Amino acid sequence: MTCIGIIGLGQMGSALAKAIRKSDDTVPLLLNRRHLNQSQALAQEVQGELVPVNRLLQEADIILMAIKPNQVRSFFKDHYKTIQSLQGKLWLSVAAGVSLTELQELTPSDHQWIRLMPNTSIEIGKGLVAYTGGDSTSQSILDKYLKASGSLVPISEDKFPAFTALAGCGPAYIYILIEAMSDAGVHAGLSRQEALAFACQVVEGAGAMVKETRQHPALLKDGVTSPGGATIQGVRKLEEAGLRSAIIEAILASSQGK
């Protein structure tokens, strides 16, 4: 039976562990983090086993690296001898900015690498996961064990910075929008609970409209704005404040790491 190991149990590593368990309720999960005693609750939730890193490296067929990008090289340096003795592993990396070429240099030639870029919505099965690398067999394995995370999208590696900025950083921008909308609702007389619930539903519904009708967002916007009405007055204020440009600049800045 295939065994999966996860190294790094921060927010992303934990979310991926949960997604894997939801995708397959029998696959053995080996978990590792620097301080093993800090993830007992997660291990129990996903029916995984907290183990030392050397055991994980030796026993796992698929190894998911969920550590920070600046820790990748030092990890492989620290465990060089063990890793060089391993055969035929499939590695998954969520380290932003660390290329497939760089990753492949860290392991024996018979190992395969797939780069992943998930967003945090995988925690509830509504995420978006871009991936590149591997062959058709390894990609089918990825589909099998991450199907509960949301949508998996193959993209070329050169598109990773743009994807990261839009889909990886994007949820933070939407949270700001939801917060601002709910603040406005409270100012207008709604309770905080009402305002937040309404704002969330508006964002969810608008996204679904674009996706399901396949109409351009501008056409859908025009369908809401009537001549001289309240909506077009609000749109004028958004344009006056430069919202459209601010969103574009935020995503471009994220894609360039600035």
Region spans (language model):
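Aromatic-residue-lined binding/catalytic grooves and analogous aromatic/hydrophobic interfacial grooves
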Residues: 170
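NAD(P)-dependent Rossmann-like dehydrogenase/reductase catalytic/cofactor-binding core
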Residues: 200, 204-258
